[in-house]
Amino acid sequence: MRYTMYKEYDKKGVVYMTTKNELNKKISTIMKTDVYTVSEEATLKEVLEVLVKYKTSGLPIVNKDNKVVGFISDGDIMKFIAKQNPRIIDMTSFITVWYDTDSFEQKLHDLMGLNVMELATTKLVYVESDYDIDEAAKVLGEKKIKKCPVLENGKLVGVISRSEILRYALSSYLEKEAAKAE
């Protein structure tokens, strides 16, 4: 969707031009540019420390050249903790399947020493900085993800999240409604 201009009148009859859809603005206007990243060499303990310290749900993973090579989210970590690994025992043709009974604490302990790339999403989903907000919303919605890196000429310049898009959309809507009420 691209910009569609149309005339709108305010209460005093003054004509002004506006966009038909406020989500046509570029994501660069609302994305977060103070991006926290982790190295592809990081352990999950280091990742969790960054997630907690900066109260974020996901982080781009960069290599030594600062190129984005993956993304790790709290969802990836929760999947690891929640999974139950089957343990198959074959006793002379009697096959038994038991599921591990590792406690949450044990799984968390096992998690801490893993390299981030063992759990990370390496099929990188990203948007370009010149995407319209509605295009970014479509990517996040179709891929069912909460946030993704924003790249410009292959370099990380920000992150965009569903919550930022929704905050912007609601704010724009409320401002427009308030202007109509004046």
Each PLM stretch: what is its role?
Residues 1-182:
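Tandem CBS (Cystathionine beta-synthase) repeat/Bateman regulatory domains
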